[in-house]
Curated annotation (Swiss-Prot):
GO terms for biological process: regulation of DNA-templated transcription; response to stress. SUPFAM superfamilies: Winged helix' DNA-binding domain (SSF46785). InterPro entries: HTH_MarR-typ, MarR/SlyA-like, Tscrpt_reg_MarR-type_CS, WH-like_DNA-bd_sf, WH_DNA-bd_sf. Residues 33-166 form the HTH marR-type domain. It holds the Pfam family MarR. Keywords: DNA-binding, Transcription, Transcription regulation. Residues 80-103 bind DNA. SMART domains: HTH_MARR (SM00347). GO terms for molecular function: DNA binding; DNA-binding transcription factor activity. This is Uncharacterized HTH-type transcriptional regulator YwaE.
Length: 171
């Protein structure tokens, strides 16, 4: 019941947004693009808040800190600029988040021996332990995200989201 109420609320929100945007002096307003972008943004925000509140708070981690730690866990040592790129944040923001993770002993920095301007970051055993403890609960949130979708709908959505990501790929 609550779920359908949220769905209706989102529809009303969409309707209100579109009604307001129709008043904008834009020649050809693509209402579907607006709906997709709005729903994608709202879904991402809700997921982020849910995960930070219900899962990541046990380690006092932000979504961004968890994302960086997760990337280090998956790929091993990464250069700071690559971490920023993967997380969709500036290098300065990445450096600040890495400092926080370093203070928690979840990662360590090392300077490239050939090019001292390059800083590589790697996950520590404590960082691995944090990911391995957090991920089962994190995954529960991921599965809640797709509750009520058939396997076919999940595959279709995955394909469509990959297209969206490809459209926004900047490098």
């Amino acid at each position: 019941m609550e779920r359908s109420h949220q769905h209706q609320q989102l529809r009303k929100e969409e309707h209100d947004t579109l009604s307001k945007l129709k008043q904008m002096p834009v020649e050809s307003l693509n209402l579907e693009a607006i709906s997709i972008a709005t729903n994608l943004y709202r879904s991402a925000q809700r997921l982020r808040v849910k995960m930070e509140t219900e899962v990541l708070s046990t380690y006092n981690l932000s979504w961004t800190a968890f994302s960086i730690l997760y990337d280090l866990w998956v790929w091993g040592a990464l250069e700071t600029r690559k971490i920023a790129e993967l997380s969709g944040i500036s290098t300065a923001t990445a450096s600040n988040v890495i400092k926080t993770l370093e203070k928690k002993s979840f990662c360590r920095k090392s300077i490239d021996t050939r090019d001292r301007r390059l800083v590589f970051v790697s996950i520590t055993d404590s960082g691995k332990q944090a990911i391995e403890e957090l991920y089962p609960e994190f995954h529960k949130g991921e599965t809640e995200l797709i509750a009520g979708m058939t396997k076919d709908e999940q595959k279709i959505l995955t394909g469509l989201l990959r297209k969206v990501a490809d459209n926004l790929h900047t490098t």
